[in-house]
Amino acid sequence: MVVRRSFDAATLTRLRAMPLSVALEFLSVHAKTDTTYLPLKDKHSRRWHVKTLRGEFEILITGSKWYDTRAQIGGGGSIDLAMHLLGLSFVDAVTHLAANEGQHGPNHS
């Protein structure tokens, strides 16, 4: 018998709204912004150097969108970022983020 895992709408909405900079705290061993980065297209873009147990990444973040410059793949939101950086399924990414959020509180600004 297959057990179906589901999440309530409030949890998914909250995690999807989580700032990516906060998500990086939960997903990485080390993450820091590149203060020398000068965005070309959007002045709000930031480049992050991220280290996880799976390797090192160079991630551009603009609002809720992210782009991995080395893998040349992008996405949107913290759940998608968790799936990419940690190689997780959707269910595992949501579980990981929600567990870490619970340790640090749900409100991030």
Predicted regions and their residues:
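N-terminal structured subdomain of primase-like DNA metabolism proteins
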Residues: M1-S109
